[in-house]
Amino acid sequence: MEMKEIKAEIKDYVRDHYKYYGWYPYDVEVGNVVYSYEEYMDILSMTL
């Protein structure tokens, strides 16, 4: 899975989670890999 795909999946999941629960998830699983809050925020801030 390419980083662009990982970033897109994280973004979709995080937006939906925030929309329904009002806060960002503690962690996100993408492609059988679990990313912590710090890790997925780093990925979302990357310029690709």
Which role does the model predict for each range below?
Residues 2-48:
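Acidic, low-complexity, intrinsically disordered interaction modules
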